[in-house]
Structure formats: C-alpha cells, structure tokens
Amino acid sequence: MAGHSQYANIKHRKNAQDAKRARKFTKLRREILVAARSGLPDPEFNPRLRSALANARRFGLPKDKIESAIKSSTDKTEGDYQEVCYMAASSGGMWPSGFAVVVTALTDNKNRTASNVKHILSKSGLVLADVSFMFESFGVFSYPKSTDFDKLMEVALEASALDIKTEKNHFDVYCSRESFAATSLELRKKLGEYEHSGLVWRAKTHQEVPPEVHVRLEKLVDALEEDDDVQRVYTSILTERQSEK
C-alpha cells in the first residue's frame, strides 16, 4: 500500500504540473493573439508581438501553436480579448500595512474575470482599491549577464532608457510605456536581440516581510494565476518569482 501511495502522490504532482503547463500555454497563446491584433502581424514591425513571441519561446510554447496564434489573429470568431487591470490593498491583519497587488488579465468576459479575481482577493484578505500611486508601469528589456555593462549603459542612455537594474541572472533596461517601440528598435540595432521584454508594473517601494508572509504570498499568486484570464501578478513584496517575469 505504501508503494501505491507513493505512485498516487507522484501521479497527482504530475497531473498538477501538466495542468499548470497547459494554463501557461493558453495564456501565452492569448498574449500572442492580442499582440498580433495590436499592430502588424509581423514581429519586425510590432515590438509587442516580438515580446510575446520571445516570451512564448522562453516558456517552451511549441512552434505550431505560435504560428496558429498569429494566424488566428485575423479570425473574427477567435475571442475578442481585452486588457483589464485590477488593483487591491490589504483590508486587515493578514498582510502588512501598505501591502498592494496589481493583477493584469486578458479576457473575453470582463464580468466573469472581475468576479473570479475579486473572490480570490477577498478570500485572501484584500479589497479592490486604487493603488496606482504605489506602482509605476514600464517597458522592460532583459539582457544576459554576459552583456558588456558599459556598452549596455551607453546604448540605454542613447535610447532614452529610464533605468537599468542588475538582477540575479540578467540586466533589465527600463523605459516608459510610450517609448517601448522606439527603445526596442534602438537596443536591437546596437546591442542585438534581448532575451525577453514586456510591459510591466513595479512597486515604487518594496516591503521586507518575514518568511511566513512570503509563504502566504506564494499561495495568493498561485490562486490568481490558476485563473485562465490572469496574465501577471505584481505586488509590493518583491519575490524572485516576480523578478523573473
């Protein structure tokens, strides 16, 4: 029976991992679809699509699914997805004072997504609230640590970048959302292809919290990301998981 129990546990973990992978692929495909519709369906002339494709390859989305998503962008019967953003703040003692969350989603049914996200947040001791003053929204481009930092700094300045952050495995170059396309072109022209890029939210100040709060935060992020419509979750508590997105 012990052997059976071990097999059941392994099977359960594998099924959970497979479900998580399938959800991720669905979200990546949707991201490509929306990006392709936002401009030309050619990544050379559509930085947002280029970013979505790089992200898809980074997470292993098969080539046939990538091509299918781009082709489907012209199909009117394929979901009419809209970008939505939800913000929330702590409503009690479960979280430290000033804790805030930003959730971005792509949905074809705003009422469904709003209901699901609000339910998850409420169960976790959070209420919908405008916390935009606690965050900044940027374009970000990631280059490997092997990149010459002096050259990166020089090109970033020429491209009107706002900041460069040194992360564990890469350098992140930040720009305004409005200059995302122009900065992308300048960086690629002078530094070559970046590893990945995107439009992100970043807390102006990150909170330091004890380990038990990090555990609670991981559960919150997991619950939100299990929703098929949710694309990204950003919080005022920095985790390694957030810095890798």
Swiss-Prot record:
GO terms for molecular function: DNA binding. Keywords: Cytoplasm, DNA-binding, Transcription, Transcription regulation. Its main location: cytoplasm. One of its GO terms (cellular component) is cytoplasm. Signal peptide: none annotated. Residues 1-22 are annotated as: Disordered. InterPro entries: Integrase-like_N, TACO1_YebC-like_2nd/3rd_dom, TACO1_YebC_N, Transcrip_reg_TACO1-like, Transcrip_reg_TACO1-like_dom3, YebC-like. PANTHER family: TRANSLATIONAL ACTIVATOR OF CYTOCHROME C OXIDASE 1. This is Probable transcriptional regulatory protein NSE_0641.
